[in-house]
């Protein structure tokens, strides 16, 4: 009999919907919360990974809405935000900014997190950047304002961003207090020049849950220029499953 085969369908990373609910491939590519290092390896190493991350913001906010047959509000919000193909108004990509901490360029996380905080959360009628979805978008703000975020809740680590205020205090249920201090913080100072944890210099790109539960004083010295030496060693990177797997081999 006659055999037929389906022709391969061309892949469009800008196409919303279909396999990517309310998003596209540029948004969902980063959804390996437990293993960013595995994704870095698949992209040929840190340089290739960082270039792909950068490309999210370099691309214009163009899209293919053919699956939905209409411009859904998430697409429109991405256009209005005008941060390339980064779509903070929907949840799948919100952790992506923090992934520069896994690839040796934490200052880029600091840059883009502050951009989002300044531009997409404002006290104006149009100052909220999208839908809430069970509190995720506001929870992102609260964590990011403190200067860290739980990229992978299955670990005990909170990945560093950049503090938004000069001081914040967390009063924990166990009676301990976490003090987050950045006295020279300001609109023009988004980069972490120096960080100390309980008075000692701290270079890692994450804090542990135990660090916080013990009570902690976390101090930041902020700067207008990025410190491109801090947090760049692999020993400073947050957890990735691939690294644990490699240790066992």
Label each residue range with its predicted role.
Residues 11-16, 32, 72-77, 89-93, ...:
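Short acidic (Asp/Glu) and glycine-rich catalytic loops that position anionic groups and cofactors
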Residues 15-28, 76-90, 130-131:
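Solvent-exposed loop and edge beta-strand segments that line ligand/cofactor-binding
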Residues 8-18, 23-30, 107-110, 136:
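Gly/Pro-rich turn-and-neighbor structural signature
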Residues 1-7:
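Short, small-residue-biased leader/transition segments that mark boundaries at the very start
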Residues 11-12, 17, 21, 50-57, ...:
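A post-motif C-terminal structural segment
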Residues 42, 57-66, 86-88, 93-249:
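Non-catalytic C-terminal accessory modules of carbohydrate-active enzymes
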Residues 25-43:
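A conserved active-site cap/scaffold subdomain adjacent to cofactor or substrate pockets
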